[in-house]
Amino acid sequence: MKNTMLALAFAAAGLVAAPAAFSQDAGQNAQQGWYVGANAGYGQVKKGPYDDGDVAGAVKGGYRFALNPETSLGVEVGYVYLGRVDARSLYSQNVGGNTQSKLQGATAGLDLRYSFSPKWYGEVRGGAFFAKGEGLTNDKFNPQQVRFNSTNYYAGAGVGYNVTPKWSVALNYDYYQASDNDKNIHLPTNLYSVSAEYRF
């Protein structure tokens, strides 16, 4: 899985570097060109020592290719911050000091967008999540605060509205898998967010 995700990231970088290879004239609703976006919302962890959430957000940028009059494919990279979450008392009472989780990291992936009309669209996305986190191990009797770096994945979906030809807003759900089995730490996070996108 790790090798697959790394290969996807390198492939995404290569595609972003070569937008001129695709046609610029694929229809009225499908979007094509460079874009940047930002999300803000609520990141929730419900696993082992953690059952809570915090303010979270993300930024991203990429290039979108029109595949047909309604469909486009974006190749994008970004960075996500998924907040700090307090541990449940069952775990934290056995640890002295900090018991909060923290999760963030870079992303590289694909975004498939379908335009229902000139104004409304839906999209699905996914790719590699290069997680950098810390938190308690999943051990009720002797939890330890550890740090980890791992290559995992993310996936999500959203519904958006084109306010103007260049600006759009959307409601989104994304899932970020973040774990290190060797260290027995698992911070899978659900992100519920609103987003804005600007297209150049």
What are these regions (language model features)?
Residues 3-5, 20-200:
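Gram-negative outer-membrane beta-barrel domains
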Residues 7-16:
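Bacterial N-terminal signal peptides
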